[in-house]
């Protein structure tokens, strides 16, 4: 089984063909094709090729499914005996993509 490890938005993802991955928001329309070129490693037929830092000529082709927002994450800080508290929420914007092809 072939897989690839790529970098997008400061994070690294390990994928195989057909996987659905949540990436940082990319402002692409649904059904649009995306090429991910920052491929760190590719394994095909048991042979692993690692890049320094990226694998030459390797890319991952993906299709945009949709965009969305994640669940709200709440951070709450309270300082005891001081009548001081802070509540802040955060929702991640993401683009859901399907990995269609790994080219190495």
From Swiss-Prot:
GO biological process: translation
Classification via Pfam families: Ribosomal_L21p
Molecular function GO terms recorded: rRNA binding; structural constituent of ribosome
Presence of keyword Ribosomal protein: yes
GO cellular component, one term: cytoplasm
Keywords: Ribonucleoprotein, Ribosomal protein, RNA-binding, rRNA-binding
InterPro entries: bL21-like (IPR028909), bL21-like_sf (IPR036164), Ribosomal_bL21 (IPR001787), Ribosomal_bL21_CS (IPR018258)
Subunit structure and binding partners: Part of the 50S ribosomal subunit. Contacts protein L20.
Role of this protein: This protein binds to 23S rRNA in the presence of protein L20.
PANTHER family cross-referenced by the UniProt entry: 50S RIBOSOMAL PROTEIN L21, LARGE RIBOSOMAL SUBUNIT PROTEIN BL21M
Family membership noted in the UniProt record: Belongs to the bacterial ribosomal protein bL21 family.
The protein, known as: Large ribosomal subunit protein bL21
């Amino acid at each position: 089984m072939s897989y690839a490890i790529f970098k997008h938005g400061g994070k690294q993802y390990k994928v195989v063909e057909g996987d659905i991955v949540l990436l940082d928001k990319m402002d692409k329309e649904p059904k649009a094709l995306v090429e991910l070129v920052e491929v760190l490693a590719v394994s095909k037929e048991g042979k692993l090729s690692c890049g320094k830092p990226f694998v030459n000529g390797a890319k991952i082709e993906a299709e945009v499914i949709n965009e969305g927002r994640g669940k709200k994450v709440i951070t709450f800080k309270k300082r005891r005996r001081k009548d001081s508290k802070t509540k802040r929420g955060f929702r991640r914007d993401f683009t859901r993509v399907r990995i269609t092809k790994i080219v190495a």
